A protein has these predicted regions:
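Conserved short histidine dyad/triad with adjacent acidic residue
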Residues: 24-27, 35-55, 74-77
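A short, N-terminal "cap"/entry segment at the start of jelly-roll beta-barrel domains
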Residues: 1-40, 71
């Protein structure tokens, strides 16, 4: 399972790898489709969110930058939260955030 879209010659801040765009949630996949682990870096613009997400495997959210709520759990930069497999959940930035999402497939 090789990673993709990551720097190899020099280090870079994780938050610099994806930029929020007004009116959307931007994403950068760090693994390939079909891998047993889906790693995605998400950038939420102010006012954007996702709801009704459910994954077959456990999902880990690591807040890279900003503040957010995952199922009403408050998170700040550096926080991590596990959402168990099959649990419907929503992600809402307060007001904008960058999040690393790791999901077991």
């Amino acid at each position: 399972m090789p990673f993709k879209n990551l720097p190899t010659g020099s280090a870079a801040p994780l938050a610099s790898l994806v930029e929020a765009r007004p009116g959307q949630v931007s994403s950068r996949s760090l693994t390939r489709i079909g891998d047993p682990l889906a790693a995605t870096l998400l950038a939420f613009a102010e006012g954007e969110s996702v709801s009704g997400e459910t994954y077959a495997g456990d999902t880990l959210y690591y807040l890279v930058e900003g503040k957010a709520e995952v199922n009403a759990v408050q998170m700040t930069a550096g926080d991590v939260l596990k959402v168990p497999a099959g649990t419907p959940h929503a992600v809402r930035p307060v007001p904008a955030a960058k999040i690393l999402q790791l999901s077991l497939i």
